[in-house]
Amino acid sequence: KDRITITDSLDRREVLHTQGEAGLKRVVKKEHADGSVTQSQFDAVGRLRAQTDAAGRTTEYSPDVVTGLITRITTPDGRASAFYYNHHNQLTSATGPDGLELRREYDELGRLIQETAPDGDITRYRYDNPHSDLPCATEDATGSRKTMTWSRYGQLLSFTDCSGYVTRYDHDRFGQMTAVHREEGLSQYRAYDSRGQLIAVKDTQGHETRYEYNIAGDLTAVIAPDGSRNGTQYDAWGKAVRTTQGGLTRSMEYDAAGRVIRLTSENGSHTTFRYDVLDRLIQETGFDGRTQRYHHDLTGKLIRSEDEGLVTHWHYDEADRLTHRTVKGETAERWQYDERGWLTDISHISEGHRVAVHYRYDEKGRLTGERQTVHHPQTEALLWQHETRHAYNAQGLANRCIPDSLPAVEWLTYGSGYLAGMKLGDTPLVEYTRDRLHRETLRSFGRYELTTAYTPAGQLQSQHLNSLLSDRDYTWNDNGELIRISSPRQTRSYSYSTTGRLTGVHTTAANLDIRIPYATDPAGNRLPDPELHPDSTLSMWPDNRIARDAHYLYRYDR
């Protein structure tokens, strides 16, 4: 039988045409539900040689005669990628259409010991156990070394970063991670049920988030440290149909193919979705009643979108790269690429002027310059330009930016690229001191110093400047929400609803005591201030469009 018909629950049909016998039977033609056809060609031993898409474009594959491994891929635009292997069939080199090469080296046991990225960066791998494929150390292009230790079961036990700081991992007898211990006393603990499902996560301060599941293993509830619940209900097929948080519910409906066709917000308003026979979104009608339509070509690319009469067309080159976009028949943006496929220009029209950004790269594909230009509407004469150049250090890290007519801005890094300082020309701008987690603890700029401290849970605790009036202390609740910012001049307190939305800000100072409430409808849209407008009867914006507030009226186009 050389023809197979597949019919799904929506009565959509796909037809597969096959050739060959027994183990060499292959699908050589596929008729899709929309009538489009794709084809495949195979050699005498069943290896893929070519694929032709629905638009008639062919991609060619060249397998090795002996191993069958792909050695070359040629895309419809004629550009090719090449792949090379050693006698163990391991990839040793790959060259992309842009000519850049990835290289890999292996030891006598077949383990990866060095990888050279297309931009020339080299990563090395070291092993201390001849019976393990897990590396004990890596060294990146900057020379920074990281080490790892593993259990005999292949579980990561510790990771030491480039500065010698250690993160340790604990596991239970089933191999599940039960704790992570980081520098600066930060730890996280995890608990599991008898089915191996995560049921609790606790931080160093004892704040615990719990998780509940149904019998099918779907996550049904997340209980925050303060006891508030975020629940999810599922249908018989395991798809989420309802989520509830703080008494507010959002629901989803699906068609027989499992696609979302209706989303109902907390306000009770709806967004609906329609799809074509290939499951591509073709229409969306939002909460506000606005309808957007989408059209695709035979290969699935978006080529036309309609937004209440505003028609946009999308155009591509042979490599499927976006080349220009038109709105109401007028060109809105253009994209240009060089022979390597790298983006070189992007432009648009603003008040008749052509505004563009031009990009330059080095031979490794790294951005070396970007030039902004503005041209005259009629003569195309250059009216204005500004160029910024980019430079890299010997390790390949970006470390210098040179704007037009200004000294270079240079940043100093350590390890694998952590920022340690910046300077303008030869003038130091700022220096950073970091803790064992590489978080900023001291910033020095001019005659000022900003000291930063963190809570045991890793949240920002305080920022103190040597100008005392600028000091700030931060307070958080058990759920990790910011509830207070205190400074010598004033204090601001924040309150939240059970859904986590900001409900009010209370500012106090020597001669100041202001409360600003933030009222929202169930979907989170701002409502009129209940204190300033006590007579307001508005309880929601059903279409998610705010029509007025205390100061303004808002009008929308189609």
Question: What is each residue range found by the language model?
Answer:
Residues 77-78, 96-99, 116-151, 156-173, ...:
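Acidic/glycine-rich beta-solenoid
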Residues 1-93, 97-113, 130-134, 154, ...:
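Non-catalytic interaction/targeting regions
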